[in-house]
């Protein structure tokens, strides 16, 4: 997801520079003082040009990849918060299964590490002031990081026929929504159970046959408790 990152809010300062100047004058500043204030406020902010608008569109990231690699299949960005990369994977697998495409790139990137982001996550008790300790009594939130990852996906039969170096096989992918719950950001055991159950049903695996599970691990009291109860219900019934 692009959305302009931190440059979006900074470029908006230039959009409102005329209003800032007028407010300063209305508050008693001279035109010269108002001009100096606006210049100082806008100093270092990106100028608005032909790349500003495209840079604020969420789809531009995938669009640039398609443009660079001359890819001619569907390209779009998915936004499902922490599950965005999984949502991209879900769509990619569906397109491959219905044979609308033969190869898909699915991935995600996150690099918006700035003060407002820290403040907002702290306000909901999700950002740890010290360190991340998921599923631990000391858990007090997670530590944010930056990174990116992308998968090249093909139907297994095609990959084997092409002699590709197959790293892993996706047997099933599942998704769900929490529906109505305690709050818009509150996790739901019902939704989690549905998503995981659908994935295992498609894979034709029983949850009890799986020996390694990668958890979300938000390191928050509510998030960890909900996820553990979900896994316990699936694995022990």
Where do the protein language model's features map onto the residues?
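Condensing-enzyme catalytic core of the thiolase-fold
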Residues: 1-237
